[in-house]
Curated annotation (Swiss-Prot):
The record marks 144, 193 as: Important for catalysis. It comes from Maudiozyma exigua. GO terms for biological process: L-leucine biosynthetic process. Catalyzes the oxidation of 3-carboxy-2-hydroxy-4-methylpentanoate (3-isopropylmalate) to 3-carboxy-4-methyl-2-oxopentanoate. The product decarboxylates to 4-methyl-2 oxopentanoate. It catalyses: (2R,3S)-3-isopropylmalate + NAD(+) = 4-methyl-2-oxopentanoate + CO2 + NADH. This is 3-isopropylmalate dehydrogenase. It is an enzyme of class 1 (oxidoreductase). Belongs to the isocitrate and isopropylmalate dehydrogenases family. It is found in: Cytoplasm.
């Protein structure tokens, strides 16, 4: 069988970013050890605070150019109090790479990697059992990229929210595609604030028309964002399916959802530049948690980053079997009790990574 090389740019970022990306690479190397026809080529570059310290900018040109040429990008975490809220901030590197690479769709699953984790949720197990939501957030438009005015001494500041029909159609098509990958198709929920905001009224109208005209077998239900935030806590399974939201609403609701499984260290994410209809969409993959500057070395949970690699394998690298194997390995390891402290365990970051890598080899052997 012909040798295939997958080119992956690794952006460890700040604080725990280095540790978690090392464990993710460990799992990918475990795959190549039992799939000799596949080789992973890793290129490491700076982003965030580490890049500011070394180069003065949060996203060096060489990191961006390398990312553009890669099959996928693996990101650790960026930010920390060291860099404050000055004019040059680590988070600017994230916003820039999303915009430059046109990573318009952020996918954040909210589910339980194993039912053995149900007791860790801040909600009652009987309420959260069966939660299976994929939040699809529009990532390169809206208020985060709109015109703005800072307070220049006059005591006035403002931000603007703007969406076009084409932007809303594009993210709706992503949600529709993902819903159709299941049999029966998943329901689609669209979150907005159409009772107040003009941009939300355009959003709702465009989502409705796009689903009706292009995905006639799907159902779409519209929910006001504040109501959805309450439902997510009271009865999260009610929102099971694909949830679509604009940039700011998606940012907030996905962070709320991330608390349901009991630890931010469990949840992966993917940011895609196109539909994964051939399993080769270009994407950036990262855990949902931050850089955890106060966490001692060896304590961070690598599961979210490793599950992000599972998404990468399935959506960008056309290695669905291997991606599923990683998910199975994570479940096996968690069920065996090998866990970091955030999951009431006593294992180190590298011990969890070692156990998952070993399980992946056994599953694929």
């Amino acid at each position: 069988m012909a040798q295939t090389t997958k080119h992956i740019v690794v952006l460890p970022g700040d604080h725990v970013g280095q540790e978690i990306t090392e464990e993710a690479i460990k799992v990918l190397n475990a795959i190549s050890s039992v799939r000799p026809n596949v080789n992973f080529d890793f290129q490491h570059h700076l982003i965030g605070g580490a890049a500011i310290d070394a180069t003065g900018v949060p996203l060096p040109d060489e990191a961006l150019e390398a990312s553009k040429k890669a099959d996928a990008v693996l990101l650790g975490a960026v930010g920390g109090p060291k860099w404050g809220t000055g004019s040059v901030r680590p988070e600017q590197g994230l916003l820039k790479i999303r915009k430059e690479l046109q990573l318009y769709a952020n996918l954040r699953p909210c589910n339980f990697a194993s039912d053995s984790l149900l007791d860790l949720s801040p909600l009652k197990p009987e309420i959260v059992k069966g939660t299976d939501i994929c939040i699809v957030r529009e990532l390169v438009g809206g208020i985060y990229f709109g015109e703005r005015k800072e307070d220049e001494g006059d005591g006035v500041a403002w931000d603007s929210e703007k969406y076009s029909v084409s932007e809303v159609q594009r993210i709706t098509r992503m949600a529709g595609f993902l819903a159709l990958q299941h049999n029966p198709p998943l329901p689609v929920w669209s979150l907005d604030k159409a009772n107040v905001l003009a941009s939300s009224r355009l959003w709702r109208k465009t989502v409705e028309e796009t689903i009706k005209n292009e995905f006639p077998t799907l159902t779409v239900q519209h929910q006001l964002i504040d109501s959805a935030a309450m439902i997510l806590v009271k009865n999260p399974t009610h929102l099971n399916g694909v949830v679509i939201a604009n940039n700011m609403f998606g940012d907030i609701i996905s962070d709320e959802a991330s608390v349901i499984p009991g630890s931010l260290g469990l949840l992966p994410s993917a940011s895609l530049a196109s539909l994964p209809d051939t399993n080769t969409a270009f994407g950036l993959y990262e855990p949902c948690h931050g850089s955890a500057p106060d966490l001692p070395k060896g304590k961070v949970n690598p599961v979210a980053t490793i599950l992000s690699v599972a998404m990468m394998l399935k959506l960008s690298l056309n290695m669905t079997e291997e991606g599923i194997a990683v998910e199975k390995a994570v479940k096996q390891v968690l069920d065996s009790g090998v866990r970091t402290a955030d999951l009431r365990g006593s294992n180190s970051t590298s011990e969890v990574g070692d156990a998952i890598a070993k399980a992946v080899k056994e599953i694929l052997a």
